[in-house]
């Protein structure tokens, strides 16, 4: 019988204050994680742990503390982590309840540390903002105004402020000069809620942009609650060839230096990467398209705005070292200035030449070896489904499943496998799939153990089924368990209730007080 080490909540909090490396891992599904978690907890659901852990926690000797809320998932996760080579793995004593009983603060939503930091920035710097009504009046006045949307382009396409241009947050300091006709032109920065517009606005102010800059207070949520109309499916983007002036680059570099961002050479980077007792993340903060066209060997794509907004998703080891790179001297500096203020040891790689960006494409995820499995092709499966006795189990995301799936398939997660199988009619054999069948492969022995029936793996996954031109079904009729794999964000999509949007804003406004109660954040706003 396995034995487990335990770490107390008080010890975790002290390690955070001491800036020692640690990863505090919540292995529940994202929707459960979003109900309550410690500030620096990272969500690595047991159901897809294999796909993410090596990217997010690359060093095998990092101290890992795993918890759930009494579901029994943490113990399974520890066994798997040990089997993959992680050497310092422990359970959080009494799990989430133990953290709460010890007096630890609990946060809701996702990316809570980044969002709380953004609210602290506004509180300290008094970041200027305008209400939805004030921005609408500015538009109606026919005065020249530039509205930039700091979210990802796909979010911008879903809904946007009329007349706005997509400029993801990490690109703002580099691109905004090319979008403003004069230094007097007002610039409005928006996101869906509050935090990305706060950081985007303050980034431009910190970069010394001469234009009057304001955040759209409460973003598209505030715009909607004011009864104003959003645009949809817009395509306006910045010119990717646009660059900032030399003066702007110098201003940004100076601010990054003030924040504590070091400038290092390749030799220093290599020395850091060879240290066995420290984690060094190397992130390329340019756009995903630029990264795919050519990037520095070993770097990971992390567009600057997303890295600041979703730091826990990219760098899941608090206390680790973060090195950033770009090819312009601005994006890494402005991104690094925020990470340094968030308490990360941050550096940027000195100017790189095009020849050094020698790797192409997006590297495949590093995952543990998958179990052996009998495979079945899409055409063979289609023939097999013509006769009774075969049930298809789909381990993709619930959103993907609802959008399209193999007719008759059931959706489930590995963390709720036993419960799901009880809800699914028994079969003579099972076929498992997901988008590519990468994740589904790990489920083969688990399904076999619980059912005692033959289990096959769909070669190439549902994508191969689609490529073969085979029929597809849509909708949620095949959900074997509740959709808990993704938290429904009140700031995404166009069908959120006014009550949910207002509650989200009120939660954001309360984050600064939560930070004060928590006391472990280490944030320092310049």
Please name every model-derived segment.
Residues 1-23, 27-146, 150-281, 285-391, ...:
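Rhodanese-like catalytic fold shared by cysteine-dependent sulfurtransferases
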């Amino acid at each position: 019988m396995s034995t487990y080490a335990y770490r107390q909540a008080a010890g975790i909090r002290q390690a955070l204050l001491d800036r020692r490396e640690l990863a505090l891992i919540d292995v529940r599904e994202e929707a459960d994680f979003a109900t309550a978690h410690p500030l620096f907890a990272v969500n690595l659901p047991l159901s897809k742990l294999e796909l993410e852990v090596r990217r997010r926690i690359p060093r095998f000797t990092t101290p890992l503390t795993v918890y759930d809320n009494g579901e029994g998932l943490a113990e399974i996760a520890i066994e798997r982590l040990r089997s993959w080579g992680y050497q310092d793995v422990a359970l959080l004593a009494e799990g989430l309840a133990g953290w709460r009983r010890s007096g630890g603060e609990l946060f809701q939503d996702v990316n809570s540390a980044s969002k709380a930091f953004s609210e602290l920035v506004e509180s300290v710097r008094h970041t200027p903002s305008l209400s939805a009504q004030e921005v609408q009046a500015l538009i109606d006045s026919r005065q020249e105004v530039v509205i930039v949307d700091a979210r990802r382009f796909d979010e911008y396409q879903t809904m946007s402020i009329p007349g706005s241009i997509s400029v993801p947050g990490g690109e703002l300091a580099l691109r905004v000069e090319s979008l403003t006709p004069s230094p007097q032109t007002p610039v409005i920065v928006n996101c869906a809620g509050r935090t990305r517009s706060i950081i985007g606005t303050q980034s431009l102010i910190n970069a010394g942009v001469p234009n009057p800059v304001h955040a759209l207070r409460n973003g598209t949520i505030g715009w909607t609650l004011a009864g104003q109309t959003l645009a949809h499916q817009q395509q306006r983007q910045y010119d990717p060839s646009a660059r900032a002036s030399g003066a702007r680059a110098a201003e940004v570099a100076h601010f990054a230096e003030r924040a504590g961002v070091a400038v290092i050479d390749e030799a220093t980077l290599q020395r850091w990467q060879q240290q066995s007792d420290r984690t060094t993340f190397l992130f390329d903060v340019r756009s995903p398209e630029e990264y795919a066209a050519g990037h520095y060997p070993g770097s990971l794509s992390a567009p600057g705005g997303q890295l600041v907004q979703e730091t826990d998703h990219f760098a899941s080891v608090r206390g680790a070292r973060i090195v950033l790179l770009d090819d312009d001297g601005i994006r890494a500096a402005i991104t690094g200035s925020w990470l340094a203020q968030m308490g990360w040891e941050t550096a940027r790689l000195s100017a790189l030449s095009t020849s050094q960006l020698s790797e192409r494409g997006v590297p495949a995820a590093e995952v543990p070896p998958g179990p052996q499995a009998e495979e079945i092709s899409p055409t063979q499966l289609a023939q097999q489904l013509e006769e009774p006795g075969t049930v298809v189990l789909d381990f993709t995301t619930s959103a993907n499943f609802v959008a399209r799936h193999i007719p008759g398939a059931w959706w489930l997660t590995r963390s709720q496998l036993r419960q799901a199988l009880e809800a699914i009619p028994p079969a003579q054999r099972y076929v498992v799939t997901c988008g590519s069948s990468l994740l589904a492969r790990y489920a083969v022995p688990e399904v076999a153990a619980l059912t005692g029936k033959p289990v096959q793996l769909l070669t190439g996954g549902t994508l191969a089924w689609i490529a073969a031109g085979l029929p597809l079904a849509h909708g949620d009729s095949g959900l074997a368990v509740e959709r808990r794999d993704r938290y429904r964000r009140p700031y995404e999509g166009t069908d959120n209730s006014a009550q949910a949007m207002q509650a989200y804003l009120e939660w954001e406004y309360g984050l600064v007080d939560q930070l004060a109660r928590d006391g472990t954040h280490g944030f320092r706003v310049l």
